[in-house]
Amino acid sequence: MARYLSRADLSHIAGKYIDQYYTRFGISKDDPEPIDPERLASSVLGLNVKMLPLCSDGSILGLTVFQRCGFTVTLGDGTKLVEMFMPKDVVIDSALASDSCTGCRNFTIAHEAAHHILADLFPNDYGKAVKCRGHIAYRERNGQPSWEEWQANTLAAELLMPTFLVNAEIERAALCLPNGILYKSASDPNYERILEMAARIGVSWSAIRIRLQQMQVINGKPIHCHPLDVIRFGE
């Protein structure tokens, strides 16, 4: 079973790796820059990030490899691809290569990197999990929730969207939500600003929304009908 780690614990762990990343690339927290998860994975963690077709239906977003093993995927036309993976391989489904999938691709890389971080830090806990599960950990689009996957998702979010970086982006975008209400409408300039923040950080709309809710910048779910929309289009 995975070790118990709170969100605060995972934030602390992420901070150490972000510090290493910033030091390696000469970035200052006084002028923070978004974290490129592929550079973090390769340069800081020593992982090998690859893009290959992993499935024909989009169900597998990525996987991380702990021990040498073979992997077979059957494509939509029936073609079988057989790959040999090595420890420290992180493989992302090639369907995520397009620019429109940047947020999902980045989060998947960070998620798989998080599995390696946790396995390295807590081998007695995660080593047992690996032996029970096999040699590979998958990130599935609609996978069953588990404690280990929650930790990997949370650590991934902390790596990509640390509080200091999000706060800097809030200031840069002049985001102002004094009552915490966000309208998911082009009539609300804050909605466009948050979309711009997501693009700059390299995450999806849903990822930045959840992060802003956790930071209590947004309260509750975004409201779809802006008052100006009612005036323009009626109820």
Each predicted region: which residue ranges?
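Active-site hotspot residues in diverse enzymes, especially metal/ion-binding acidic/histidine motifs
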Residues: 1-235
